[in-house]
Amino acid sequence: RPTLVFNLCDGYDDVGAPGLSVVRALEEAGLAYTGADSRYYEISSSKLVMKELFRGAGVPTAGWEALPESGPVDGLCERLGAPLFVKPSASCASYGIGLESVVHTDEQAAARRDTLRSGEFAKWFAGDTIFAEHFIDGAEYTVLMGGYWDDPDGIWSLPPAERIFDNSIPESERFLSYDRYWGYYKEETPPEDGRAF
């Protein structure tokens, strides 16, 4: 009788949240499973790897630069064009994303990097690259796609979904931060009257 494993493990193994190791074990065992295969998992776990693939395929993406582990980032804003968005390369569910992720100076960029290295999320990003990319102000969309890398004609997608933010939020803050994603509001003020962002 065929077996299908519903794989809900999509974490990062190096911080104790099973992910790629489970996918590889399922593949080695020859079991059918739901979710991405190991090849996709490997390339999609790093935003920098994805951005390089986008660039190589001619897909427009905001300019970016990996930040040094510590010290100043002189000329960063001039090279990429402020404002910038500072974030970890390997992150999901808005971990490490906050209102301070949008920076306007080199000093703010270095400070945000240092916060990611030493703050609440430091354990998640210990071996990760922190990078900055040009902040694109505008609508935020999500598109779910499926298929196989070796069968590009079989790739499908659902209609794009736009995240609509409350008009009270300044345009430069209309992105999904950790507080908004999870509704914890540790760094941000919750919306008035229980309104959703």
Language model features: what each stretch is:
Residues 41-131, 137-139, 148-151:
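Active-site nucleotide/adenylate-binding loops and adjacent lid/helix of ATP-dependent enzymes
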